[in-house]
Amino acid sequence: MSQNIDKIQDHVELFHQPEYQELFENKKALQGMASDEKVAEIAEWTKTWEYREKNFAREALTINPAKACQPLGAILAAVGFEGTLPFVHGSQGCVAYFRTHFTRHFKEPFSGVSSSMTEDAAVFGGLKNMIEGLQNAYSLYQPKMIAVCTTCMAEVIGDDLGSFIGNAKADGSVPQDFPVPFAHTPSFVGSHITGYDNMMKAILLNLTDGKKPTTSNGKVNFIPGFETYVGNLRELKHLTSAMGVDATILGDNELYLDSPNDGEFKMYQGGTTLEEGADAINATKTIALQTYPTVKTLEYIEKEWQQPTATYRPWGIKGTDEFVMALSELTGNPVPPELELERGRAVDAMTDSHAWLHGKKAAIYGDPDLVMGMLQFMLEMGVEPVHVLVHNSTTEFEEEAKALLASSPYGQKATVWGGKDLWHLRSLLFTEPVDFLIGNSYGKYLWRDTKIPLIRIGYPIFDRHHLHRYSTIGYNGAINLLNWIVNGLFEEIDRNTNIPSKTDISFDLVR
């Protein structure tokens, strides 16, 4: 064996060793797999227009989805509030998946519990699990609030969360006045952004239950949406502070998802206080930074709180300008020199790199609001989007995206693909290649197959560290986006021009 105490091989090298290569060959023979030549033949066929037509004729099969299920978004909304423990009414396996999904992206512990439903609960209902689960969660983890959502199992059998929680309180599992907001989050409907919306609405409804708007507190509420860049929360606080806005961020998970290593574990870090959440009903306005994960929440605020709402996407120069000017109009404060300086730096950086991006063709996939923000920025840089794919799409998103693309000379060649998955995108990239692809870590398989460089922007990002700490919004965020894209293209140029005396005529020191 090449792996021994004197010669430790990491996993990158280990499986290239002869004994493992022999094992893999024996496995292929045992399983009766097709020959390498046949696999290569079929692989080539999947790159053709003929295969693309068959691929797009799929109706009842998803291959490599570009979305997740509702509870994932629900628990992200929950941890944005002080001392809140997400409680998933369903099996342990589901909540383990949700927690590891966030832990791998943020590189932080992510707390959450389940009602541990098994076969008996699937037949007889999960009331007993709810009663015992809430009691254990309350006594063991001492939260200030428990936010309950559901998985497929609980939804298929029709468990009534409101009734179950009421019975649990009557049974003494938690005090009667203890806040237990709940949201039904069936995974077979919508996606993670729907779950975020459902839980955010449920928490605000619970915290303001029985309250009516009184005298305005002079504050402005901000709802980040399904936000996986903690740098964006810091950037939001920076922009609102610079503009003199008395802001309440509803669902502030910045510290929870980017906590310091100070030698002491804290289960609940940061978050919007429950008092701030309850007082949000008295704000002058609520502003969302994402449209599609806040639809029901904003409808609730407008109807029940009688509070005006608005949505802004501060991506790129134009989007940030609109956001900053809206804050200026809201407060009556002028734009401070600090933000003018940041804007000038962003414009200068974009001017420096414009020649390298102008006219480049791009493909992008991700959540609706992230894709809209990136389209705004790319069009400002003269990038020409070709494939715009959103798996968790809606008719409203597709109309909005098409209108944005039609408004720019650089968006005329783009096609919006709603409800399509990453296997669809693979066909698109082979039949209509582009210069670069923007997406999350799952795009690396598209990069491997098509050799189209991947710029990692989105969620989840598992295979690169610390990108979630940066901002993508504001003037500072525009510089980050530019940095990732243009330097990603430079890396690709260097990879393609590094053979001495053959391709290195453009292996330049200065770009």
From Swiss-Prot:
Which cofactors go with this protein?
[8Fe-7S] cluster
The EC number on file is 1.18.6.1
User: Among its keywords, does the record have Ribosomal protein?
Assistant: no
GO terms in the biological process aspect are:
nitrogen fixation
Catalytic activity, as annotated: N2 + 8 reduced [2Fe-2S]-[ferredoxin] + 16 ATP + 16 H2O = H2 + 8 oxidized [2Fe-2S]-[ferredoxin] + 2 NH4(+) + 16 ADP + 16 phosphate + 6 H(+)
InterPro entries reported for this sequence: ChlB/BchB/BchZ, Nase/OxRdtase_comp1, Nase_comp1_CS, Nase_Mo-Fe_CF_bsu, Nase_Mo-Fe_CF_bsu_N
Q: Where does [8Fe-7S] cluster bind?
A: 69, 94, 152, 187
Q: Gene3D superfamilies attached here?
A: Nitrogenase molybdenum iron protein domain (3.40.50.1980), Nitrogenase Molybdenum-iron Protein, subunit B, domain 4 (1.20.89.10)
Cofactor descriptive note: Binds 1 [8Fe-7S] cluster per heterodimer.
The EC category is oxidoreductase
Look up the record and report any one GO term of the cellular component aspect.
Answer: molybdenum-iron nitrogenase complex
Alphabetically ordered keywords of this record: ATP-binding, Iron, Iron-sulfur, Metal-binding, Nitrogen fixation, Nucleotide-binding, Oxidoreductase
Q: Which domain of life, per UniProt?
A: Bacteria
Q: Which family does it belong to?
A: Belongs to the NifD/NifK/NifE/NifN family.
Annotated function: This molybdenum-iron protein is part of the nitrogenase complex that catalyzes the key enzymatic reactions in nitrogen fixation.
Assembly with partners or alone = Tetramer of two alpha and two beta chains. Forms complex with the iron protein (nitrogenase component 2).
Under which name does UniProt file this protein? Nitrogenase molybdenum-iron protein beta chain
Q: Lineage of the source organism?
A: Bacteria, Bacillati, Cyanobacteriota, Cyanophyceae, Oscillatoriophycideae
